[in-house]
Swiss-Prot record:
The lineage of its organism: Bacteria, Bacillati, Bacillota, Clostridia, Eubacteriales. Gene3D superfamilies: 1.10.132.30, 1.10.150.390, 1.10.1790.20, 1.10.40.90, 2.40.40.20, 2.40.50.100, RNA polymerase II, clamp domain, RNA polymerase Rpb1, domain 3. This is DNA-directed RNA polymerase subunit beta'. Zn(2+) 2 binds at residues 795, 869, 876, 879. It comes from Clostridium botulinum (strain Langeland / NCTC 10281 / Type F). The gene is rpoC. GO terms for biological process: DNA-templated transcription. Belongs to the RNA polymerase beta' chain family. Pfam families: RNA_pol_Rpb1_1, RNA_pol_Rpb1_2, RNA_pol_Rpb1_3, RNA_pol_Rpb1_4, RNA_pol_Rpb1_5.
Length: 1178
C-alpha cells in the first residue's frame, strides 16, 4: 500500500489534459457559489457538493441520508456521496475550455520556454496568442514561410493573391498548439547539436538555450503541447473558502473571483460558438478567456493586474506560493505547533543550570493530557472525561498529580529571534507561582535575553524519543560551549563577575592582616565574626591527602580567595602541582575577571566535562550574587573623579593647534595635512586624559572595578564619564576637528550636546537597518548550506588544504594553533630540525598537539578540510574534524551546514555597517563590516577594486607626468604593464618579486579574477581569509570550518565548456561530482570526456542551483524555479533538511537519518539511564 509519508523522492512535471480530467470529480459549469438564502452550494457551481463532497459530515445535499450508517452511499436524489466533509479539502474539479489557452508561466517567463522551443520571439508569440497577428501554419505551395506573422491586412491580401485554401494561417493558442504539436523533439535535438558545432557568439548562446529546453522536454517525457491548456483544474473548495460574516455578507478567497471570471467567459464563448457568431466577436471573447486564465494562474504577470474592491490586485495561484506569506514559507516551513505557550521572563538566580521556572497555570494547560492520564491511573478519576472535568475545574488534587507528571518531563524554551542552535534549549521545569517564566541567569547570553520585558515560548516534547533527545542533547547544562568557536557561552556576567572579582581582591592594611589560622574553617568563622576583613592577606594551614599520603603546610592567601576556591576543582592546571611547594596552593590565586572566568570554565569543561562544569557554574553564580550584594558596589557621581592634569593637557593642546593653524595660514602645509595633524593631536590628548584618569582611580573605585572586571562598561565609557568625550564624527563618517572637551560628569554645553546627537542618531538608524540585513544574510546562508550533513566516517581523500596563520599587515589575525586544533593532518607532520614525526596523517590533533606543531616552528600544514572532502552529499567526519559545540569528534548525522550558517549569521548584528573613508581625493571607500561579508559571500565585484597582477615576476616602476605605470617582468622576459590611476595607493616597491594574483594597489580584489588567475584553491583561500578579517576586527571568533562549509557550496558547480561525447550541454552548470561521474562513464566506453571549469556562485545563486527544486522554490523566485523544474521533470531526492520539512517527513539528520530510523525504543523500562538529572544533583 502507498503510505503518504513513505517515499524517497518527489517528481514534478507538466499535467496533460487527460491527467487533469483523471484528478477531477466533475466539471464546474456555473459561476455560482453559495445560495445566499439556503446557504447551500449551488449545483454544478464552484462549491458544488456533488463534485467536491458534502458540506457536513455524513449528510447529503437534500437531507435524505444523514448519519454515519449511510457511509459511502451516493444519494439518488441529489447525487452527493455520504462521507466526511474533509474530502472537500482534497477533491478537485475541472473546467472544459471552449478554446485552448496558453499557460502564462511558459509563455511569459524569462527566457520564454514556449518561444525557445518554437524559435519565435516572445513578442511575436504574444501577438499570436492575444489575437493581434496570424501565424502561417502550412504555407503549402505559396512563397510564405512557416511561422511567418501576418497582420489582418497582409492576411487578406495573401488570401486574395493565392486563393482561399492555398495556405493555412491561424491565430490564438490553437495556432500555437498546432505548432507545438508538430515539433519532433528527437529531430530538433539532432539539428540543434549540429548547428552548435558551427555557430559562435550570440547565436551560439541562443542555440544552447533552445537545446536546453528541447532536451528537457525530450528527457522528461513532457509534451510541448501541454504548455497550452484545454482543461483547467479547479482546486478543492476548502482551500479557497467562502465564509459568512456577521452582517450577512460573504468573505471569499480571491481565487473564487478569478475562477468565476474564467467560467463566465468560457460559457459566453461556448454560446457564441453555438450561435455561429462573427469571427471578430469570437476572437475577442477568446482573447478575454486567455486573459482570465492568465490572471488565475499569475495575476499581474502580463498587463494590468485584475483588481478587486478598493483597487487591490487579486491573489492568484502563483501568489499563493510566493514570498513570505506564501504557502511554502508561511505554512510548510513555518507551522504552528500545539502544546506550546509563551510568557514574560524573569530572572531565577536560585535555579540550577538545568532548571527553569514554569508558571503553574501554564504547566497545567501544557501537560493537560498527561495529567488526565495520571489522574485515571492513580484512581482519582473514573474515566478520561471526568479527569478532564477535574482539570478544567482545577480541583486541588490536580496540583499534586501535575508535580508528579512534570518531575521527569523536560520542556524546551525558545526566544525569538533564534539566531543559533542555542536559541532553543531544554530545561527541567519547576512549578512557580505567578505568571512569568523563570530563566537561569547563565543561559541569558546564549538566548541574548534580558529581563526588560522579553518573552519566551515553551514547547513540550511529547514522545519518549523526543524527551530523550531533549534531555541528553538539548539540556542547558550540556550546552556550555558555543558551536561557532568552541568557547564557553555560559560565562557569568555582570553581578556574578563583580562578586567574584570583589572576592578575589586583596588590600593592604585592613583588619586581620598577617594573622595565621589553623584551618580554612577557622578563617570563615573569623570572617563571619568580623574579626578579619575579606581582603586581608593572611596565612592558613592546609591539609591534603594526595595518593594516600597527607601533606600539610602554610599558604598565604585572603579569606575571599578561600571562599571562591571552594567552588573550583583544584586540578585545572593553573598551578604546576608537580613542584612540591605548589601542592597545597589554591588553584585560583589571582584576580578573577570575566576573561579569566571564561578560561576557568574552558579548563574545567575540557578536564571534567559538562555535568561538573555546570555544577561549578552554579556555585560561582551563587557566590557572585551573594558577595556583590554584600560588597555593596554601586555607582555615585563622586566616583567619577576628573583628573587634575586635564586642564593643563587641554591648554597645551590648544596652543599646539594654534601653531598648526598658523603654519597653514602661512602656506607651509596643505589643508589635508593641517586636518590630519589637528585630528592626531586631539586623539593623543584624549588618550592622555584617559590614561591620567585611569591612573588616578583607586583600585577599589566601584566604576573602575566594574570596567576592570568586565562586569559592565569599558575604559572608553569611563573616559567619557570622567575624562573627556573626545572627537566625534558627522553622519557621513568624517571626523570633526572640534573635540568635545567636557566629560559627562562636568556636563556638555549646547554645541557639544548637538554634535553628540549626530553620532547617537546615526547609531540607532544603523542598528535598525543592520538587524534586517543580518537576518537576510543568515537566511541565504542557511539556504545554501542546509543539506550539508555529516554522512560518512571517512571519504578516503588523499588531498589536503594548506593552512598558515592569517595576517593583516604585521598583525596576526588568526594564529596557526587555532587553525589546526580539532583537525586531521592529510600528511605526516615532521619536525623540521629533529626529523621525528610529530603527528601521523589522519590522526586527530587536539590543542596540545597543535601547539606542539606550532612550537616546532612549522609555518604551513596540510590538513583534511571540508574543501577537499570527496563525499558526494554532505561531508565526512574526518574532513570536518571536531564538533565545536562539544569539543568531541563530530558524529555522523550532525547538521553541520546549518550550524555553519548560524555561526556566521548570528554575529552579523555585531558587525558594523560603516564604510571607511580613506584619505586622498580618489581614495576608494573600503567596505567593511556586514556589507563586506555580504559582498564576499555573493561573490560580487567589490567597490574600490585593487589592480591585480595576472602574472608572476619582478616589479618595475615608471612614472611620467601624465601617469604612473607598473610593469611586471616575468621570468622569461615578457612584460605586462598596468596603469595606476591617481589617488590609489601602491602596495609594491621597485624590484619586488610578486606572484600571479597579488595586488599591486590597495583595495579589494574581484574574487572571479582570483579564480581565473590562481584557480579554485586560490579563491577559496581568499574568501576564507577575507571573511575572517572582517569578523576578527570586530572581535568575533568563528572557526574556519564553518566558512569552509559555505565556501565549498559556492564552488561546487562546474560550467561545461565542451560536452565531448557526454550528454551534458555546453554552458550549463553541473555539480562537480556529477561531472566527474559522467566523464568516468564516457572514458570507460572510450569516448571523449566533457571539459568544464569551476564556477564561483554567490550564495543566492548557489542556493537556487541546488538539486532540490522544493528547497529552491521555497527560497526565492518560486515561479521561475517551478517552471524550470516542471519542464525538466525534475526529481527531488529529498536529501536536504528543508525539502523534508516541507513534505512533513523527519529530517535526515541526527536520529532522523535512515540508519537510525529502524531502531526500536522500548519504553517499559522506566529508568532510562539513571535519569541524567540525578547525576547532576551532586
Amino acid at each position: 500500500m502507498f503510505e503518504l509519508n513513505n517515499f524517497d523522492a518527489l517528481q514534478i512535471g507538466l499535467a496533460s489534459p487527460e491527467k487533469i480530467r483523471e484528478w477531477s470529480r466533475g466539471e464546474v459549469k456555473k459561476p455560482e457559489t453559495i445560495n445566499y438564502r439556503t446557504l447551500k452550494p449551488e449545483r454544478d457551481g464552484l462549491f458544488c457538493e456533488r463534485i467536491f463532497g458534502p458540506m457536513k459530515d455524513w449528510e447529503c445535499h437534500c437531507g435524505k441520508y444523514k448519519r454515519i450508517r449511510y457511509k459511502g452511499i451516493v444519494c439518488d436524489r441529489c447525487g452527493v456521496e455520504v462521507t466526511k466533509a474533509k474530502v472537500r479539502r482534497e477533491r478537485m474539479g475541472h473546467i472544459e475550455l471552449a478554446a485552448p489557452v496558453s499557460h502564462i508561466w511558459y509563455f511569459k517567463g524569462i527566457p520564454s520556454r514556449m518561444g525557445l522551443i518554437l524559435d519565435m520571439s516572445p513578442r511575436a508569440l504574444e501577438k499570436v496568442l492575444y489575437f493581434a497577428s496570424y501565424v502561417v501554419l502550412d504555407p503549402k505551395e505559396t512563397p510564405l514561410l512557416k511561422k511567418q506573422l501576418l497582420n489582418e491586412k497582409e492576411y487578406r491580401e495573401s488570401i486574395d493573391k493565392y486563393g482561399d485554401d492555398s495556405f493555412v494561417a491561424a491565430m490564438g493558442a490553437e495556432a500555437v498548439k498546432t505548432l507545438l504539436d508538430e515539433i519532433d523533439l528527437e529531430q530538433s535535438s539532432i539539428e540543434l547539436k549540429e548547428e552548435l558545432k558551427t555557430s559562435t557568439g550570440q547565436k551560439k548562446i541562443r542555440i544552447i538555450r533552445r537545446l536546453e529546453v528541447v532536451e528537457s522536454f525530450r528527457k522528461s517525457g513532457n509534451r510541448p503541447d501541454w504548455m497550452v491548456i484545454d482543461v483547467i483544474p479547479v482546486i478543492p473548495p476548502d482551500l479557497r473558502p467562502m465564509v459568512q460574516l456577521d452582517g450577512g455578507r460573504f468573505a471569499t478567497s480571491d481565487l473564487n473571483d478569478l475562477y468565476r471570471r474564467v467560467i463566465n467567459r468560457n460559457n459566453r464563448l461556448k454560446k457564441l460558438l453555438d450561435l455561429g457568431a462573427p469571427d471578430i466577436i469570437v476572437r475577442n471573447e477568446k482573447r478575454m478567456l486567455q486573459e482570465a486564465v492568465d490572471a488565475l494562474i499569475d495575476n499581474g504577470r502580463r498587463g494590468r493586474p485584475v483588481t478587486g474592491p478598493g483597487n487591490r490586485p487579486l491573489k492568484s495561484l502563483s501568489d499563493m506560493l510566493k514570498g513570505k506569506q506564501g504557502r511554502f514559507r508561511q505554512n510548510l516551513l513555518g507551522k504552528r505547533v500545539d502544546y506550546s505557550g509563551r510568557s514574560v521572563i524573569v530572572v531565577g538566580p536560585e535555579l540550577k543550570m538545568y532548571q527553569c521556572g514554569l508558571p503553574k497555570e501554564m504547566a497545567l494547560e501544557l501537560f493537560k493530557p498527561f495529567v488526565m492520564k495520571k489522574l485515571v491511573q492513580n484512581g482519582l478519576a473514573h474515566n478520561i472525561k471526568s479527569a478532564k472535568r477535574m482539570v478544567e475545574r482545577v480541583q486541588p488534587q490536580v496540583w499534586d498529580v501535575l508535580e508528579e507528571v512534570i518531575s521527569d518531563h523536560p520542556v524546551l524554551l525558545n526566544r525569538a529571534p533564534t539566531l543559533h542552535r542555542l536559541g532553543i534549549q531544554a530545561f527541567q521545569p519547576v512549578l512557580v507561582e505567578g505568571r512569568a517564566i523563570k530563566l537561569h541567569p547563565l543561559v541569558c547570553t546564549a538566548y541574548n535575553a534580558d529581563f526588560d520585558g522579553d518573552q519566551m515560548a515553551v514547547h513540550v516534547p511529547l514522545s519518549v524519543e523526543a524527551q530523550a533527545e531533549a534531555r541528553f542533547l538539548m539540556l542547558a547544562a550540556h550546552n556550555i560551549l558555543k558551536p561557532s568557536d568552541g568557547k564557553p557561552v555560559s560565562v557569568p556576567t555582570q553581578d556574578m563577575v563583580l562578586g567574584s572579582y570583589y572576592l578575589t581582591m586583596d588590600k593592604d592594611g585592613v583588619k586581620g592582616e598577617g594573622k595565621v589560622f589553623s584551618c580554612p574553617e577557622e578563617v570563615l568563622m573569623a570572617y563571619q565574626c568580623k574579626a578579619v576583613d575579606i581582603h586581608a592577606k593572611i596565612k592558613v594551614r592546609l591539609k591534603k591527602v594526595i595518593d594516600g599520603e597527607t601533606i600539610e603546610g602554610i599558604i598565604e592567601t585572603t579569606p575571599g580567595k578561600i571562599i571562591f576556591n571552594e567552588s573550583i576543582p583544584q586540578d585545572l592546571g593553573y598551578i604546576d602541582r608537580t613542584i612540591p611547594e605548589n601542592k597545597l596552593k589554591l588553584e585560583v590565586d589571582f584576580l578573577v575577571s570575566k576573561k579569566t572566568l571564561g578560561g576557568i570554565i574552558t579548563k574545567c569543561y575540557m578536564k571534567h566535562g559538562a555535568t561538573k562544569t555546570s555544577i561549578m557554574l552554579d556555585k560561582i553564580k551563587a557566590k557572585g550574587y551573594h558577595y556583590s550584594t554584600i560588597g555593596a558596589i554601586t555607582i555615585s557621581t563622586s566616583d567619577m573623579v576628573v583628573p587634575e592634569s586635564k586642564r593643563e593637557l587641554l591648554e597645551n593642546t590648544e596652543k599646539q593647534v594654534e601653531k598648526i593653524q598658523k603654519m597653514y595660514r602661512r602656506g607651509f602645509i596643505s589643508e589635508e595635512e593641517r586636518y590630519e595633524k589637528v585630528i592626531d593631536l586631539w586623539t593623543k590628548t584624549t588618550e592622555d586624559v584617559a590614561n591620567a584618569l585611569m591612573e588616578s582611580l583607586d583600585s577599589f573605585n566601584p566604576i573602575y572595578m566594574m570596567a576592570d572586571s568586565g562586569a559592565r562598561g569599558s575604559k572608553s565609557q569611563i573616559k567619557q564619564l570622567a575624562g573627556m568625550r573626545g572627537l566625534m564624527a558627522n553622519p557621513s563618517g568624517k571626523i570633526l576637528e572640534l573635540p568635545i572637551k567636557a566629560s559627562f560628569r562636568e556636563g556638555l554645553d549646547v554645541l557639544e550636546y548637538f554634535i553628540s546627537t549626530h553620532g547617537a542618531r546615526k547609531g540607532n538608524a544603523d542598528t535598525a537597518l543592520k538587524t534586517a540585513d543580518s537576518g537576510y544574510l543568515t537566511r541565504r546562508l542557511v539556504d545554501v548550506s542546509q543539506d550539508v550533513i555529516v554522512r560518512q566516517e571517512d571519504c578516503g581523500t588523499e588531498e589536503g588544504y594548506e593552512v598558515s596563520e592569517i595576517k593583516e599587515g604585521n598583525e596576526v589575525i588568526e594564529p596557526l594553533v587555532e587553525r589546526l586544533s580539532g583537525r586531521y593532518p592529510s600528511e605526516d607532520i615532521i619536525h623540521p630540525t629533529t626529523g621525528e614525526v610529530i603527528v601521523k596523517r589522519n590522526t586527530y590533533m587536539d590543542e596540545d598537539i597543535a601547539q606542539k606543531v606550532s612550537d616546532a616552528g612549522i609555518k604551513k600544514v596540510k590538513i583534511r578540510s571540508v574543501f577537499t572532502c570527496k563525499s558526494k552529499h554532505g561531508v565526512c567526519a574526518r574532513c570536518y574534524g571536531m564538533n565545536m559545540g562539544t569539543s568531541q569528534k563530530i558524529h555522523i548525522g550532525e547538521a553541520v551546514g546549518i550550524v555553519a550558517a548560524q555561526s556566521i549569521g548570528e554575529p552579523g548584528t555585531q558587525l558594523t555597517m560603516r564604510t571607511f573613508h580613506t584619505g586622498g581625493v580618489a581614495g576608494a571607500d573600503i567596505t567593511q563590516g556586514l556589507p563586506r561579508v555580504e559582498e564576499l559571500f555573493e561573490a560580487r565585484k567589490p567597490k574600490g577594486l585593487a589592480i591585480v597582477s595576472e602574472v608572476s615576476g619582478t616589479v618595475k616602476m615608471e612614472e611620467t607626468k601624465k601617469k604612473r605605470t607598473i610593469i611586471v617582468v616575468t621570468d622569461d622576459g615578457e612584460e605586462v604593464s598596468y596603469d595606476i590611476p591617481f589617488g590609489s595607493r601602491i602596495k609594491v616597491k621597485n624590484g619586488d618579486i610578486i606572484s600571479a594574483g597579488d595586488e599591486i594597489t590597495e583595495g579589494s580584489i574581484n574574487p572571479h579574477d582570483i579564480l581565473r588567475i590562481k584557480g579554485v584553491d586560490g579563491v577559496k583561500n581568499y574568501l576564507l581569509s577575507e571573511v575572517q578579517k572582517v569578523y576578527r576586527l570586530q572581535g568575533v571568533d568563528i572557526n574556519d570550518k564553518h566558512l569552509e562549509v559555505v565556501i565549498r557550496q559556492m564552488t561546487r558547480k562546474i560550467k561545461i565548456e565542451d560536452s565531448g561525447d557526454t550528454e551534458l550541454l555546453p554552458g550549463t552548470m553541473i555539480d562537480v561530482f556529477d561531472f566527474e561521474e559522467a566523464n568516468r562513464e564516457i572514458l570507460e566506453k572510450g569516448g571523449e570526456p566533457a571539459v568544464g571549469r569551476i564556477a564561483l556562485l554567490g550564495i543566492t545563486k548557489a542556493a537556487l542551483a541546488t538539486d532540490s527544486f522544493l528547497s529552491a522554490a521555497s527560497f526565492q523566485e518560486t515561479t521561475r524555479v517551478l517552471t524550470d523544474a516542471a519542464i525538466k521533470g525534475k526529481i527531488d531526492p529529498l536529501l536536504g533538511l528543508k525539502e523534508n520539512v516541507i513534505i512533513g517527513k523527519l529530517i535526515p539528520a541526527g536520529t532522523g537519518m535512515t540508519r537510525y530510523r529502524s531502531i526500536q525504543i522500548n519504553t517499559d523500562d522506566e529508568n532510562i539511564e539513571e535519569d541524567s538529572m540525578d547525576s547532576m544533583e551532586v
